[in-house]
Amino acid sequence: MSSLLNSLLPEYFKPKTNLNINSSRVQYGFNARIDMQYEDDSGTRKGSRPNAFMSNTVAFIGNYEGIIVDDIPILDGLRADIFDTHGDLDMGLVEDALSKSTMIRRNVPTYTAYASELLYKRNLTSLFYNMLRLYYIKKWGSIKYEKDAIFYDNGHACLLNRQLFPKSRDASLESSLSLPEAEIAMLDPGLEFPEEDVPAILWHGRVSSRATCILGQACSEFAPLAPFSIAHYSPQLTRKLFVNAPAGIEPSSGRYTHEDVKDAITILVSANQAYTDFEAAYLMLAQTLVSPVPRTAEASAWFINAGMVNMPTLSCANGYYPALTNVNPYHRLDTWKDTLNHWVAYPDMLFYHSVAMIESCYVELGNVARVSDSDAINKYTFTELSVQGRPVMNRGIIVDLTLVAMRTGREISLPYPVSCGLTRTDALLQGTEIHVPVVVKDIDMPQYYNAIDKDVIEGQETVIKVKQLPPAMYPIYTYGINTTEFYSDHFEDQVQVEMAPIDNGKAVFNDARKFSKFMSIMRMMGNDVTATDLVTGRKVSNWADNSSGRFLYTDVKYEGQTAFLVDMDTVKARDHCWVSIVDPNGTMNLSYKMTNFRAAMFSRNKPLYMTGGSVRTIATGNYRDAAERLRAMDETLRLKPFKITEKLDFRVAAYAIPSLSGSNMPSLHHQEQLQISEVDAEPINPIGEDELPPDIE
């Protein structure tokens, strides 16, 4: 799965092995050259933006809550000779294996009955998820949260942290949690039968005092004071954990470092052959490590209510029955160890994987939100139809990976149809009006938003009513993939506009697509435009924040024929204007082309530095071989992508099932290339050395 997540990063982005994060927000994006041209009956004007900047912002705060759920067992890691030819556990073979164990001398049928019950519950995902959380809480523990800080601000209205997280307190990431420790006990070799509801794990060698503390905290309740996304609330996994350790257990030290956590994870995965459990936990943390900072005030509605993180019940009998684990392990994928190996080598890559995953998910959710509920493929059915009727729960990482498949046009496979992880579609499915609390910054704010209060004063708190969820993120890493008019994410585009007689100086748009292109390219050139809706009389401006530099027409409230009037005499050049539009004459043709992409990443308005060796790609043959083996396995779950299609009014969309033979969509990625990473031992090379400053507007 690390190969898939690597492939979501664009080719121009070359991550390093070390990332220094000390702020709760990171702005990521790209600089690119944009060549623009304006032509009318009077002549042609050209302009270039050699260093245009487009970005999204993510934060280490989020509204999540963990809940314990029953999930399917993950059987990878058990000895292969207890499975039948269909990949199912055979209790007769289990009994044979137990009867040969030197640890079990009597009452084998009874042991087999206990083993049968426990093996069909086996799942270590939540334990690894919590251990991964502890790793990054320790590593980036100095990140601070301030409840009175601004979460979102666009000049008309702002949203404060305390409005989104009313029960929060100021804290650093590490100080936001005071974790108790569950009991970590040595498994008594003379124990007659498994203790009810007490998992038992295997361990190599002696459990150090620091590992004892890590395991105890990972099994305990997380009850945070501040809304850091990875420190979200979660219930206790177990009151007690048995460890079958040949050299014993040291008492808890009460302290440890993030490197100690990495060591403990590596030992635990290896001893229990739990590589697939770790992979599921890695995907869960990729879902929750960071959250989007919304692009609009209305998009904050995605995050008003807590997102549920499904955490599978911790169940493991490996410590009770080591004879069922320590021989030639069963596994569904030959690549089952890759995610752990990749994480051990490049733990900071999880940040980039998280950014890439949530961007793909929220960009595609912006498409799903535009689909009619009466369509066959809609917000309720897209996951079920993607897996072609396989029995899965419509929650967790399966939903996110379906969105990733739809965003990239790529088929994705999983070894098990697990339902663990964050379910981020709840806001979309609730189908009711969502109220977003904001602070007024401009008394004209009610003209732009559906606010409860129509007369406001600066500094007043009011509420924006949101019925249609707009996109929370724009395409950045996925810019140019499966492009739509909705997101205006083309590498090049053009529009032709017929002007009324010159003494009139007005343009009328009856086509939403043409209107959006015109407004977007005008904003890209550096011109402010205001249009009038000829039906309702309301105003629409081509406002866009500086980090996107493009107008995104997301208004879906309008029903019926689009009709907008633009008075060209009111067009105003911005402080930074690259193509000035003066006295337009006759037919206008506007076009642009983007080239020369360079990665950019900022924190606190300063470049965010990456150091160390490069994470590089190698030949794709290994992945393709693995993919062919994967397709031949009946047990695996395949998520098939749907193709987004826009209707005449592009604000409304629909999905169609495409050919799965491959995508020829032009993009910044090689669509079939899944990257496998290795360290290139080159000298330290901060990203800032080959980065240009963003446009200032």
Curated annotation (Swiss-Prot):
GO terms for molecular function: RNA binding. The keyword RNA-binding applies. The keyword RNA-binding applies. One of its GO terms (cellular component) is viral capsid. Residues 666-697 are annotated as: Disordered. Keywords: Capsid protein, RNA-binding, Virion. Capsid protein self-assembles to form an icosahedral capsid with a T=2 symmetry, about 40 nm in diameter, and consisting of 60 capsid proteins asymmetric dimers. The capsid encapsulates the genomic dsRNA and the polymerase and remains intact following cell entry to protect the dsRNA from degradation and to prevent unfavorable antiviral responses in the host cell during all the replication cycle of the virus. Nascent transcripts are transcribed within the structural confines of the virion and are extruded into the cytoplasm. It comes from the Viruses. GO terms for biological process: viral translational frameshifting. This is Major capsid protein. Belongs to the totivirus major capsid protein family. Residues 688-697 have a biased composition (Acidic residues). The gene is gag. InterPro entries: Major_coat_LA-virus, Major_coat_LA-virus_sf. It is found in: Virion.
